[in-house]
């Protein structure tokens, strides 16, 4: 029978490290939080990598620094200057407080620390080399005030953890994301990120939140944002939110900090989304940058080792105030008339995937939808084949007789059955099958007359470098030319001459947001995004001929009854059901 035993210190430290240090970005996060807590105003993050992985992380700050005694203590588990006893946990004002970071990092890496206290009169600094949690070197060195910590050979003694790391670009994207979130929460600090000797990101100290946003995400986005403010006796809300026309396919760009701590909160993200009401479609999310100051007695940050999750007292009042503040900000800018749907010229009904698209002008409001991107002429022979090809999933023959709410096509079957066709879901199914077929044949790109240029934040550009082969499978041809700038030279033929970068940007964001998918799952997700983005939207008026051809195209698909997401494309009311509804016979 197995006996209970006390684990040795090395095993304990590695278990603790597994909770705190998941990947290189975890190291960056812990070191940056320590630097911010040390009252730094300038922080340099220097990352080195080879073609396969990140090899070294060095963080340099101009903070308070440490004495030789403090430097040694810093590597002891649960040694901290942030709190003294359990009472301090109820009002934590620093980013770190457990005293686990350096000990956890040193347990699974080789760490070199150089530090000199600020204003203490010390003529020399302290240098420590720690390997596997043990201090193997200690010496005096010349050093500026502040602290530099270099981390190398991460997970050298835990190969099982190392093999689960993602590609170099994916890990870099996570590093950039950590710096972005802390830079947004701490405008009083100047951050600079260098990768292999090249500057990748830089923010200015005390330049204001908008300047930080502009530096990280671009001036165009910063100029389009709407300021939001709100207040309760225990809560202050400040930040910026996007207009409804600037939305995303997932909530990953809702950035929230509470008392200077960047956090992830589904409840707060949902409150932000709630504030938009019907200004956004159900599957769209805003861009938001919120800074919340909450009474520390209402915030429990001692929930998870990474401190990204928190608990809030009076959560319902807080989320309600956030939703109200967002609603008020949008109302104050008269945005109710904005429509977040895609421009009409980006919507396509494809009849022949191989046909070269020709752009057409946007129609007048209320005019029938013009699908000039694709030819909509099918020969009589093609129409007859459409009506006869297929198996048991083939749609019954039906004739469109109109539209309801510019969203549903009303059609009648030969036996009097009434059909309602969701035009977006139907077209999404058509495009999905076309893109899948083109991908499988490895011949599905439509070259753009003018390449679409994408200027991305470092986080997204790193993700895109990894995603280029995956996007190529779908028909996107993407080249990198310059720092964080890419040219989209071709798109899936089913999309036609799309000139909006939103499809590529949303695909990248989705891939970055969910790395848990396997390669086939990620490829499937990309195909779904391409189909959804390219499909005609609800609210687009279709001519009778376009309605008919969309139904014909739907009938040719392998699974015409549902869209790729599983929603129905067609609902039917047969004659007996209609008679019953009107109590006939």
Curated annotation (Swiss-Prot):
It comes from the Archaea. GO terms for biological process: mismatch repair. Gene3D superfamilies: 3.30.230.10, Histidine kinase-like ATPase, C-terminal domain, MutL, C-terminal domain, dimerisation subdomain, MutL, C-terminal domain, regulatory subdomain. Keywords: DNA damage, DNA repair. One of its GO terms (cellular component) is mismatch repair complex. SMART domains: DNA_mis_repair (SM01340), MutL_C (SM00853). One of its GO terms (molecular function) is ATP binding. InterPro entries: DNA_mismatch_repair_CS, DNA_mismatch_repair_MutL, DNA_mismatch_S5_2-like, HATPase_C_sf, MutL/Mlh/PMS, MutL/Mlh/Pms-like, MutL_C, MutL_C_dimsub. Belongs to the DNA mismatch repair MutL/HexB family. This protein is involved in the repair of mismatches in DNA. It is required for dam-dependent methyl-directed DNA mismatch repair. May act as a 'molecular matchmaker', a protein that promotes the formation of a stable complex between two or more DNA-binding proteins in an ATP-dependent manner without itself being part of a final effector complex. NCBIfam families: mutl (TIGR00585). This is DNA mismatch repair protein MutL.
């Amino acid at each position: 029978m197995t006996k209970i035993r006390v684990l040795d210190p090395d095993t304990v430290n590695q278990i603790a490290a597994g909770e705190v240090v998941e990947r290189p970005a975890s190291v960056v996060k812990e070191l940056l939080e320590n630097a911010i807590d040390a009252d730094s105003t300038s922080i340099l993050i220097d990352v080195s990598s080879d073609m396969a992985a990140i090899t070294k992380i060095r963080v340099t700050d101009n903070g308070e620094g440490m004495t030789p005694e403090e430097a040694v203590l810093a590597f002891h588990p649960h040694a901290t200057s942030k709190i003294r006893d359990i009472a301090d946990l109820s009002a934590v004002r620093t980013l770190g407080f457990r005293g686990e970071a350096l000990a956890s990092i040193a347990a699974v890496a080789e760490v070199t620390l150089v530090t000199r206290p600020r204003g203490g009169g010390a003529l020399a600094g302290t240098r420590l080399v720690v390997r596997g949690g043990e201090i193997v070197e200690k010496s005096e060195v010349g050093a500026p005030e502040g602290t530099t910590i270099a981390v190398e050979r991460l997970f050298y003694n835990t190969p099982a953890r190392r093999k689960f790391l993602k590609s170099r670009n994916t890990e870099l994207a996570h590093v950039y994301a950590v710096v972005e979130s802390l830079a947004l929460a701490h405008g009083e600090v100047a951050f600079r990120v260098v990768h292999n000797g090249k500057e990748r990101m830089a923010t200015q100290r005390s330049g204001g939140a908008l300047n930080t946003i502009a530096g990280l995400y671009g001036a165009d986005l910063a100029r389009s944002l709407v300021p939001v403010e709100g207040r309760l006796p225990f809560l202050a809300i400040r930040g910026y939110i996007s207009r409804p026309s600037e939305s995303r396919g997932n909530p990953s760009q809702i950035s929230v900090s509470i008392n200077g701590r960047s956090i992830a909160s589904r409840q707060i993200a949902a409150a932000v989304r709630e504030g938009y009401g019907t200004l956004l479609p159900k599957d769209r999310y805003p861009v938001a940058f919120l800074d919340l100051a909450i009474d520390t007695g209402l915030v429990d940050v001692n929930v998870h080792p990474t401190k990204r999750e928190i608990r809030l007292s009076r959560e319902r009042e807080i989320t309600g105030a956030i939703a109200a503040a967002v609603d008020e900000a949008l109302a104050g800018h008269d945005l109710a008339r904005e429509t977040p749907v895609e421009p009409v010229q980006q919507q396509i009904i494809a009849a022949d995937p191989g046909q070269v698209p020709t752009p057409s002008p946007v129609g007048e409001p209320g005019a029938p939808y013009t699908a000039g991107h694709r030819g909509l002429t099918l020969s009589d022979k093609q129409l007859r084949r459409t009506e006869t090809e297929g198996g048991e999933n083939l749609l019954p023959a039906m004739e469109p007789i109109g539209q309801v709410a510019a969203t549903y096509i009303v059609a009648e079957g030969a036996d009097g059955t009434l059909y309602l066709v969701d035009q977006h879901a139907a077209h999404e199914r058509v495009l999905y099958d076309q893109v899948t077929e083109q991908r499988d044949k490895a011949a599905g790109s439509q070259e753009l007359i003018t390449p679409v240029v994408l200027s991305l934040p470092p986080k997204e550009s790193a993700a895109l470098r990894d995603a280029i082969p995956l996007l190529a499978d779908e028909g996107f041809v993407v080249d990198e030319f310059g720092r964080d700038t890419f040219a989209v030279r071709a798109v899936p033929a089913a999309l036609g001459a799309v000139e909006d970068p939103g499809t590529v940007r949303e695909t990248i964001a989705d891939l970055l947001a969910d790395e848990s998918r396997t390669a086939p799952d990620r490829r499937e997700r990309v195909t779904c995004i391409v189909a959804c983005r390219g499909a005609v939207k609800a609210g687009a008026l279709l001519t009778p001929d376009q309605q008919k051809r969309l139904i014909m195209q739907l009938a040719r698909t392998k699974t015409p009854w549902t869209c790729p997401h599983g929603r129905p494309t067609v609902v039917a009311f047969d004659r007996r059901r209609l008679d019953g509804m009107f109590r006939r016979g």
